[in-house]
Amino acid sequence: MRATGTLQVLCFLLSLARGSEMGNSQAVCPGTLNGLSVTGDADNQYQTLYKLYEKCEVVMGNLEIVLTGHNADLSFLQWIREVTGYVLVAMNEFSVLPLPNLRVVRGTQVYDGKFAIFVMLNYNTNSSHALRQLKFTQLTEILSGGVYIEKNDKLCHMDTIDWRDIVRVRGAEIVVKNNGANCPPCHEVCKGRCWGPGPDDCQILTKTICAPQCNGRCFGPNPNQCCHDECAGGCSGPQDTDCFACRRFNDSGACVPRCPEPLVYNKLTFQLEPNPHTKYQYGGVCVASCPHNFVVDQTFCVRACPPDKMEVDKHGLKMCEPCGGLCPKACEGTGSGSRYQTVDSSNIDGFVNCTKILGNLDFLITGLNVDPWHKIPALDPEKLNVFRTVREITGYLNIQSWPPHMHNFSVFSNLTTIGGRSLYNRGFSLLIMKNLNVTSLGFRSLKEISAGRVYISANQQLCYHHSLNWTRLLRGPSEERLDIKYDRPLGECLAEGKVCDPLCSSGGCWGPGPGQCLSCRNYSREGVCVTHCNFLQGEPREFVHEAQCFSCHPECLPMEGTSTCNGSGSDACARCAHFRDGPHCVNSCPHGILGAKGPIYKYPDAQNECRPCHENCTQGCNGPELQDCLGQAEVLMSKPHLVIAVTVGLAVILMILGGSFLYWRGRRIQNKRAMRRYLERGESIEPLDPSEKANKVLARIFKETELRKLKVLGSGVFGTVHKGIWIPEGESIKIPVCIKVIEDKSGRQSFQAVTDHMLAVGSLDHAHIVRLLGLCPGSSLQLVTQYLPLGSLLDHVKQHRETLGPQLLLNWGVQIAKGMYYLEEHSMVHRDLALRNVMLKSPSQVQVADFGVADLLPPDDKQLLHSEAKTPIKWMALESIHFGKYTHQSDVWSYGVTVWELMTFGAEPYAGLRLAEIPDLLEKGERLAQPQICTIDVYMVMVKCWMIDENIRPTFKELANEFTRMARDPPRYLVIKRASGPGTPPAAEPSVLTTKELQEAELEPELDLDLDLEAEEEGLATSLGSALSLPTGTLTRPRGSQSLLSPSSGYMPMNQSSLGEACLDSAVLGGREQFSRPISLHPIPRGRPASESSEGHVTGSEAELQEKVSVCRSRSRSRSPRPRGDSAYHSQRHSLLTPVTPLSPPGLEEEDGNGYVMPDTHLRGASSSREGTLSSVGLSSVLGTEEEDEDEEYEYMNRKRRGSPPRPPRPGSLEELGYEYMDVGSDLSASLGSTQSCPLHPMAIVPSAGTTPDEDYEYMNRRRGAGGAGGDYAAMGACPAAEQGYEEMRAFQGPGHHAPHVRYARLKTLRSLEATDSAFDNPDYWHSRLFPKANAQRT
């Protein structure tokens, strides 16, 4: 039985050891400090206990269980392992207190001043309910305090407990009496020591059974079974990590006497330096950082800083630091916006210890004297000294009354700044007036008056202020900021000797004496001017810095005849007063100071230099040898061999650990530097071959062994993208990269050789392209780029569409254009530009990826088939789809689709269409629909990217220009409407950039772009003159039922044939032309103000609506006319940059739903032939006029004059439908009637004086006045003249010249052409132009 009991105890101890190892993460809960006081009945007390201690392991405080009923279930207390204060159990009726895991009661707080456990009166005199058992089966340690258990009538076995084995303090009081009498005996395995009658209730002895060699607790009776000195409550082994609980602190499972200090002694620098492994004391645990609601005070986690310290944020750590005087305190001032109008006796106490006044300070007569109206007594003048702590006033200082016995304002002697954020009356920040007894100002520390004026007046005794150089105090211009008058005359002040001290400089002074100088002539000491510093004599010795005298360090020895120090530190002394430790003078040599490897001990030699003791000295020494150690000489001499062996072993271990640590840290630093060197382009990588040094290509050629693929990120038409790591040869670092594997699908070619194109791709380096780190040739080509964890821009806009704003979208458009322009400069065609191939380097910076990949493939692999699922047909230009022709202008087409994706937040282009249908739709003029957020300005930029003729598409340089211009005013071009409500998150919109920031950040210097758009607008306004006039009507909103087409497929027709059918006949009613409601191609959102369209903020539906109104006449005129010559209209005319194309005579062309003119090749009469070339989609131009003073009506894309004759009725059939010229107010002469038979010739464009020949774009509706021959657009006639090929045609009809007999040519729509005419391989298609060319040659 005895052996069985011993085995059970050992098993129990092992289970405790495992629990201690797993218990590093403890549930901590607060204790209470109520004593015997309770609130409510027994049920209420039980609920309070349950809320406090459910699943609690460590009670930070006291565990108080008082007045709990007999039916209370206290099983939730079983998890408590430690109580830092005391345990109080009183006046309860439950039978068992279940604390089976309680091991340690620390007793940091004791009950009644001396007891850590207090158990009393736990029974009910009127019933049999009482406490019968304390189940403290694992309690083995009470670190402080005694035990009191008395008057518990039914409580048993308390007298069997050996409390001396539990209580650590020898003299602690233990009172156990008057408890249960008729108790069952302990179980026989417990040997008379138990907490209850069962075999599991035995007391665990950890001190009285120990061998004499043990200083504390033990885990067995043998001498080698002693616990570590820092253990509490027992242990499972001799190490400090084997403790059941820690006596002082638990540092990551090890019991230590103190947590790692924040400062350690460095033997090399002889200084205390920050310890990188410091930890802080949080209760009984060492933590690397305090909880978020605690602050660090030295090495402790505290709830609040002590009064003489202030809380500061240092490197993200909240710490308590000494204030160095008075701790900062901000107080509310007086005056406007404050609760008080003046300083008075009712609020003077609120300024105690204030260092900063938030607002103003007013001293009025109602505040210093009795205020009978508000019943405020007079102010005690002595209380004005509370303002001696004030250093800053953010508002103004107004002193209009002052106590008679105070002759200056010395209570503000520490005031340094008057902010002037709020000013008094006429802009005064310092106002002093009508103080009859004041002789000097006394603002000896005032250095700055940030804003406002100075007013000093009617102070009859005031002197000294005449000498002040106010320009040193006033920030900014000081002219007219001083108003000083009606004070004591300067002559009287000089006669009485009220002048500045001779030690003051020419800057003047605030009053008499050397302490009132604005600046000193020689030196100053603590604000007082002096003739010299104590360099060679006087106490203390001083040194000078910026004309100020500072004391030497106290450990410096005063020298005679020479300087004592040259700085304030202990290392700046010429000689030391006591001892020198390295370069520093110290009061004593280090004795037990904690170093990186343990305590440091030193001794002073004959020259008072501190020398290190022998490494085996643990209590100091008198010399360098082992026998010079203090306190251990006899022990060490008695066991010399053992000491040497232990010393050598420890030294070797320390050397190994230290070397391992240094090696690990060095490798870590080396890896960081290597990664920076490999990833940053700034450091050129040395080529493998010296012959390559002349080649500036920075592409690295990888080996197969350097790259490891981790997972597949995606696949495309050119290959598969993997996430991987790059391990440079000879390095141990792992750099995350993206690896794109390109394989020859035919299997006939490998990528063993490194071509010039591969090196050219690797040499590209720009902020808005994904940089190629290198490539790995082989059977498949592997392109390695830096891994961008944010992913593609396509996924980003889909996920964050609710938070993206117009500024960010336009900025991204600029950056993509800049990246593509850089590729264009380096002759690199992308071929696969799409939003999925634009990566996010940061939320505000994008980079173009996957450029130049197609050129790495063999010719067979470059043939893209329509049937291939991954072929990017929807992003390709027509010439690329049909002929495999890839140029920078085909990339422009893809850029337009990419911008469309961006503006639709990642919508799929041509959704719902098969790939084989897309080329036919594009040939017919169909294009993607206008995104809802885009105004017509942005959409027209996209449309120009999708022109059939690649030569008239904009370049990336021009696209960067255009988007940069729009990025200056994002809400003008992108209108994003989101539902507002309490749950709607605000959009994370970046701030709008200024013009200078856009010039520096968005456009590179090499673009050489003209960013002075304001000057262009002014020039445009000047050239327009009075041509812009008020419209006679505005657009009306169509009803939803009027919509003809809702583009569900994500595209819109460029040539809407039904537009002509929707146009109704016009009639002249009452001399005024009436317009009907136009029919829209898209549903228009309701609730949108019509005025937005005139400000440049229109949706796609509204833009089409506005354009078609200029074609279709209606029967009603708008009620609210609005000028069209506003800023949005001019902005649109600037943004719609059109290619220079020939013009057609009036009556031969008609705009489609997007404002594009679709002329036929041949003019058609009654029997004209339709055979000929197709006309490509183009933009209409507007002819000039000589009559500038007439009223015209403008629309975005067209203009229409009031009073034009009615049109002939429209034909009913589509075949009979003709195109009608939009400017119907032409001067129709007799020659115009014959224009139907005249061939058309291209217009000659005469550049104006303000333009350059290489200007690629002109504005859409730019009006010219008389003398338009020298303008941007040349006038054109109906028929060519013999001498010049054309004659001038008047664009506007003169008064009284009507030609109602003129017939308009009927042209067939593009949609109705035969398949042979629209086939893409038809050469006529590619030789077509926006306007027919008479001398075009067929090829």
From Swiss-Prot:
Main subcellular location: membrane
Catalysed reactions, semicolon-separated: L-tyrosyl-[protein] + ATP = O-phospho-L-tyrosyl-[protein] + ADP + H(+)
Q: Where is this region: Disordered?
A: 1023-1052, 1078-1215
What positions does the domain Protein kinase occupy? 707-964
Q: E.C. number, please?
A: 2.7.10.1
Enzymatic class: transferase
GO biological process, alphabetically ordered: axonogenesis; cell surface receptor protein tyrosine kinase signaling pathway; cellular response to insulin stimulus; cellular response to mechanical stimulus; circadian rhythm; cranial nerve development; endocardial cushion development; epidermal growth factor receptor signaling pathway
Please provide the record's free-text comment about the domains of this protein. Answer: The cytoplasmic part of the receptor may interact with the SH2 or SH3 domains of many signal-transducing proteins.
| Name under which the protein is recorded | Receptor tyrosine-protein kinase erbB-3
Q: Which gene encodes it?
A: Erbb3
